[in-house]
UniProtKB/Swiss-Prot annotation:
This is Cyclin-dependent kinase 4 inhibitor D. Interacts with CDK6. The keyword Heme does not apply. ANK repeats lie at residues 41-69, 73-102, 106-135, 138-165. Its main location: nucleus. It comes from Mus musculus. The keyword Amino-acid biosynthesis does not apply. The modification N-acetylmethionine is found at residue 1. Keywords: Acetylation, ANK repeat, Cell cycle, Cytoplasm, Nucleus, Repeat, Tumor suppressor.
Length: 166
């Protein structure tokens, strides 16, 4: 990787991390920075973006950023959005092809991460498309994880989706 490529990747990642959609647009449209340019840590702007800024995610995705890029631990932007509870950003990612059944290095789906953090709106959004029978590295399905955590509200959401015939 050339130093010049890293510099533009750092600039795009920095703007995305700050949630600066105007600078992201400028870099993508005027300077023609590739939306998947890597920063000095080998991450793309979508991986380091401010997840509370769905406009940044939308701009990167509209310009061709990969919604399923994973870091060394197998974490993708959809995992991060689910874990942090940013539903609007998660919706943008999914609308642009993010895989809600992607596994991270612990075998967790994004819905597992949302359950661990207690994000009921994220669980409600992910449940219809998630593999609710998938077991993470601890051997737990999403429902079993919710039960283990004593999260009755999440259990109710999951059970409602498991009763719907496919």
């Amino acid at each position: 990787m050339l130093l010049e490529e890293v510099c533009v990747g750092d600039r795009l990642s920095g703007a995305a991390a700050r949630g600066d959609v105007q600078e992201v647009r400028r870099l993508l449209h005027r300077e023609l920075v590739h939306p998947d340019a890597l920063n000095r840590f080998g991450k793309t702007a979508l991986q380091v973006m401010m997840f509370g800024s769905p406009a940044v995610a939308l701009e990167l995705l509209k310009q061709g950023a990969s919604p399923n890029v994973q870091d060394a631990s197998g974490t993708s932007p959809v995992h991060d959005a689910a874990r942090t509870g940013f539903l609007d950003t998660l919706k943008v990612l999914v609308e642009h092809g993010a895989d809600v059944n992607a596994l991270d290095s612990t075998g967790s789906l994004p819905i597992h991460l949302a359950i661990r953090e207690g994000h009921s709106s994220v669980v409600s959004f992910l449940a219809p498309e998630s593999d609710l029978h998938h077991r993470d590295a601890s051997g737990l399905t999403p429902l079993e994880l919710a039960r283990q955590r004593g999260a009755q509200n999440l259990m109710d959401i999951l059970q409602g989706h498991m009763m719907i015939p496919m």
